[in-house]
Amino acid sequence: MAKDNIEIEIQVNVEKIKPLEEFLKKNAKFESEDHQLDEYFSPAHKNFVAERPVKEWLRLRDTDGKCYITYKNWHYTEKGEGTHADEFETELKDVSAARKILESLDCKPVVMVDKIRKTWRYKDYEIALDKVKGLDESVEVEYCGNMDGVDPQEKKKEMRDFLKEIGCGKLRSNKGGYAFLLLFPEEAEFKVH
């Protein structure tokens, strides 16, 4: 979840997961293991997934019965790399009612992301190990500290360096996130760090 409505995160596949798992067991606070169903929507008047890179996402999330609606607006460099997102999220009482509202407003479902997420807290990071149906296992690291004066690109580099320092080896980051990878696998772009 974003801090101050800003989200700075990396989403990577790591060459070696064991060093991270061992580090988290010894040094981080385990928070939860959840089954998350993320359903993404696009309004008829503005097709979010037609633009490249995809800038906006509208998501309904069901986390073992706890439901949220989230809107993300990504900011990109001139090279098309995401720096951070404006994120607005609120809890819902009934995800099926929210789905009906969105569909009544002519928002069409575009993709479902089905994942098991294990989450830890370490210092200013939320670290998640994700198993997404149809994709490789991934690691997501989100910065949850003070946002005053933070350079998103520097913070993302710091997160990658953290994973390398504990022995994860090469990192492969994707530019579009899980929803994009499932929707457009042929357009997936990865960067090795």
Regions from the PLM with identified roles:
Residues 9-11, 140-144:
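Active-site ExK catalytic segment of metal-dependent nucleases
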Residues 68-70, 128, 140:
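General beta-strand recognition
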Residues 148-177:
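Mixed-charge, glycine-accented linear interaction segment located at domain edges/termini
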